[in-house]
């Protein structure tokens, strides 16, 4: 059985891990980093960049650099107006009222953008393992709705992954924290404040069982919001002084975002930071600079509403679990935003104990996902994960009331049936309107799907018996069926339409993603070949110079002829021509070397072999070093950085 990788698909950063010899390993990406920015950029010529390369060019390409896409996953266009106004890229209304990212007229769904990030994580794992990866456990915020979970699963499918399990992020973190503590009975609170979402989960650990007792949270509260209070403060200060709103200019907004994120991070370890943005915007033809000092106290004042918003979900989660703060043995901090000192302080004040800092908040979720992958393959034994559904599920009944079938914090998988009847005489069909939420009225909850049960025999109201069944799988994804007990007729729906994508659309996007991956592979091979040719040209010229007059003119001429052919093919980026010229150059150089060897009785120069590993180096890595060098010698080369 192949490896099942664990992926933390984050709002700000993503991380991938795998189980190796019963130990979870966080895998570094091609840039050598253990986390990858969840950023996708579209650049000239149709090329895509993902991760750090995308982040580096964001300021000069703000309208085609996509970040925080997780906040759009599984939501309708109307639900993400706040997010749309915060990002410099263009988001438009698509089919089924879904948000789509507009890149020069091509509309991308949030699932497609997320799939590009997942492809990067998949490739990272494949490079490390040396084998193809087809299965993954992907994490989501515990408070993600059914539509958001389904959208995440679709993103995995588009990326070419079979998503074996969707796991809640706090639950994954508890697995990573508690795997070596399975012989202890303890109650833990996992406080997970990431880049875009906040979750609090209360769990009981004992005898290898990880049981979630309750969960609560806010899917629109996270590091992005802390960035934006700084962005708004900077923009308002500049507008007060200069009369111009920087947030209306995409490039200025992107610079503000980068500066705000940097300032927020610095204020976790220092009490004051200077924000210095030269030439931020011309005003009346005069270039203006933005220079401000932000203290930790001022930042905490700006972000106080966000920090306080974390407490009510904690209080509700404890209440739902039937526990008090004194019952909690350990508080685990997860997510980069928990590094903010004011967040740590309020957690300690609420729970009455200092939170544990024994886990890496950026990596622990991916580690837990990898452990769950090991549970599924059988590598990890004697571990049972019992998760819950975060929100109540039900249907709309007469009078616009929501009738709950499954209450929030019910352990999953679970199945529940209830019998309903018709509201009017001779009603031939019923509409099953499926809802998710905690409010009493249907209109105040989230609509996640509708379907009809037709062919009900004519009868007085109250006579037909319609059995509605809700079935939630281990991924937290819902299936609903309705059965007319009189006729035995059944109609069912898997709640997929709420994500806005049909099966055909997912299939098409998957094929496009695979085609793009193949195109990316070919492009890399092309660049590798150009780099090999460049290396061979350099080595040949160097050896010709070293040989000098030792090489007879009649031997030197064919080498120079072949070298010129290689230079011309390299300049034209003619791959077939490069292959032919490299072969010819090797041949003539070897022939000349052999003749010199025979004439001198040994000690001839070898041919200018291109280093096969040279072209494969990532820009910014150890380019120019050959892994094939057995004597430790390294040839220094000039190269053009290619991304």
From Swiss-Prot:
Keywords: ATP-binding, Chaperone, Nucleotide-binding, Phosphoprotein, Stress response. It comes from the Bacteria. It holds the Pfam family HSP70. InterPro entries: ATPase_NBD, Chaperone_DnaK, Heat_shock_70_CS, HSP70_C_sf, HSP70_peptide-bd_sf, Hsp_70_fam. The lineage of its organism: Bacteria, Pseudomonadati, Bacteroidota, Bacteroidia, Bacteroidales. Acts as a chaperone. The modification Phosphothreonine is found at residue 197. This is Chaperone protein DnaK. One of its GO terms (molecular function) is ATP binding. Induction: By stress conditions e.g. heat shock. Residues 599-643 are annotated as: Disordered. Belongs to the heat shock protein 70 family.
């Amino acid at each position: 059985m192949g490896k099942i990788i664990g992926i933390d698909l984050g709002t700000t950063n993503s991380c991938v891990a795998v189980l190796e010899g019963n130990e979870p390993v966080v895998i570094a990406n091609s840039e050598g980093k253990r986390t990858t920015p969840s950023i996708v950029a579209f650049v000239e010529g149709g090329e895509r960049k993902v991760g750090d390369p995308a982040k580096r060019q964001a300021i000069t390409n703000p309208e085609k650099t996509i970040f925080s896409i997780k906040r759009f996953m599984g939501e309708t266009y109307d639900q993400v107006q706040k997010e749309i106004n915060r990002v410099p890229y263009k988001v438009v209304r698509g089919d089924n009222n879904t948000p789509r990212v507009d890149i020069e007229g091509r509309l991308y769904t949030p699932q497609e953008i997320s799939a590009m990030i997942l492809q990067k994580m998949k490739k990272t794992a494949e490079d490390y393992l040396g084998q193809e990866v087809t299965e993954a456990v992907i994490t989501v915020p515990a408070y993600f709705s059914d539509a958001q979970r389904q959208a995440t699963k679709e993103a995995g499918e588009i990326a070419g992954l079979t998503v074996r399990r969707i796991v809640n992020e706090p639950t994954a973190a508890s697995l990573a924290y508690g795997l070596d503590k399975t012989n202890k009975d303890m109650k833990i609170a996992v406080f997970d404040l990431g880049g875009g979402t906040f979750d609090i989960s209360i769990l009981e650990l004992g005898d290898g069982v990880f049981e979630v007792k309750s969960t609560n949270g806010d899917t629109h509260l996270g590091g992005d919001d802390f960035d934006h209070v700084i962005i708004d403060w900077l923009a308002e200060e500049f507008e007060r002084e200069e009369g111009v709103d920087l947030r209306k200019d995409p490039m200025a907004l992107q610079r503000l975002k980068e500066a705000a994120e940097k300032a927020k991070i610095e204020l976790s370890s220092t009490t004051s930071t200077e924000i210095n943005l030269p030439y931020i915007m011309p005003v009346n033809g005069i270039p203006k600079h933005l220079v401000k000092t932000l203290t930790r106290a001022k930042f905490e004042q700006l972000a106080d509403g966000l920090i306080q918003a974390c407490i009510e979900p904690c209080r509700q989660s404890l209440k739902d679990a039937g526990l008090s703060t004194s019952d909690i043995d350990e508080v685990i901090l997860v997510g980069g935003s928990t590094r903010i000192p004011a967040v740590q302080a309020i957690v300690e004040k609420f729970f009455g104990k200092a939170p544990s800092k024994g886990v890496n908040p950026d990596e622990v979720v991916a580690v837990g996902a990898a452990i769950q992958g090991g549970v599924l393959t059988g590598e990890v034994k004697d571990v049972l994960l019992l998760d819950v559904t975060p929100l109540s599920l039900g249907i709309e009944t007469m009078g616009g009331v929501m009738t709950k079938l499954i209450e929030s914090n019910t352990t999953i998988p679970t199945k529940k049936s209830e019998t309903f009847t018709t509201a009017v005489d001779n009603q031939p069909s019923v509409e099953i309107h499926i809802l998710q939420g905690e409010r009493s009225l249907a209109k105040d909850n989230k609509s996640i799907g509708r379907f009809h049960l037709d062919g009900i025999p004519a009868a007085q109201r109250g006579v037909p018996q319609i059995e509605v069944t809700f079935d939630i799988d281990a991924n937290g994804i819902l299936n609903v069926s309705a059965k007319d007990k009189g006729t035995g007729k059944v109609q069912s729906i898997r709640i997929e339409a709420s994500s806005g994508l049909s099966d055909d659309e997912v299939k098409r996007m998957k094929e496009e993603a695979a085609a793009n991956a193949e195109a990316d592979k070919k492009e890399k091979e092309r660049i590798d070949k150009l780099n090999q040719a460049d290396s061979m040209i350099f080595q040949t010229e160097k050896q010709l110079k070293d040989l000098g007059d030792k090489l007879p003119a009649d031997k030197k001429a064919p080498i120079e002829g072949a070298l010129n052919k290689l230079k011309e093919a390299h300049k034209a980026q003619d791959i077939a021509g490069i292959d032919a010229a490299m072969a010819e150059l090797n041949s003539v150089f070897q022939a000349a070397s052999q003749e010199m060897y025979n004439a001198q009785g040994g000690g001839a120069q070898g041919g200018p072999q291109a280093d096969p590993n040279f072209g494969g180096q990532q820009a910014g890595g150890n380019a120019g070093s050959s892994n094939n060098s057995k004597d430790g010698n390294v040839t220094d080369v000039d190269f053009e950085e290619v991304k």
